[in-house]
Amino acid sequence: MRVILHDLSIEEKGAYLADQLRDTDKIIERKEKEPLPCMGCFGCWVKTPGTCVIKDGYENTGAYLGNAEEYIIISKCSYGEFSPFIKKVIDRCISYCHPYFVKRNGECHHKMRYSNSLKIKVIFYGDNLTNEEIECMEARSKAMAINLGTTNITTEYLKSFEGGIKLWK
C-alpha cells in the first residue's frame, strides 16, 4: 500500500495525480476541517496505542504508515519547510513510533512500532525556490525519514507542475 499525503487542490489532484492512483492507495488530503495540531498528550502512545486521541479524521495516519510500503508526500514549500497542513499531519503520525527511545546512528530516536520499512518520496513545489530553502527542505526530509526508521528517501523539487508529478509505479 502507498500512503499519499498532499496539499494539492482538487483540480491539481485531478490533473496531475488521478491517472497514477491505485485502488489500494490511502490518500490523505484536506477535508472540510483542517487537522488539529498534535497536543503532545501521549494519548496515541498510552490511551489508544497507534491512534491519535484527537478525532478529526486524521487520527489514523500513524496506523496507515504502519501498513504501507511507500509514503509519498507532496507539499508546497513554505519558507524551506512543509506547508502548514502537511506539517500538522506529519506531526500526528507520531503514533507510528513507540514512546521509548533507541540510539540510531549515535542519535536518540523513538523505537519503531511497526516492522515495515518505508520507502519515502517527498515532492516540494513552489515558485522561485531559493538554494537556502532547498537545503532546508533536504535536511528536513532526511531528518523525518530517520525519525520514521528509514534512510530510503528521495526528495524532488518542482518549480511548476508542467510535465506532471511522477509517483513511483
Language model features: what each stretch is:
Residues 77-79, 126-131:
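Short histidine/acidic/glycine/proline-rich micro-motifs that form metal-
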Residues 73-74, 97-105, 121-126:
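Glycine-rich anion-binding loop/nest that anchors nucleotide
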Residues 111-119:
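Short, conserved loop/helix-junction motifs that constitute active-site signature segments
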Residues 93-108, 149-155:
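Short, acidic/small-residue loops that bind anionic groups at enzyme active sites
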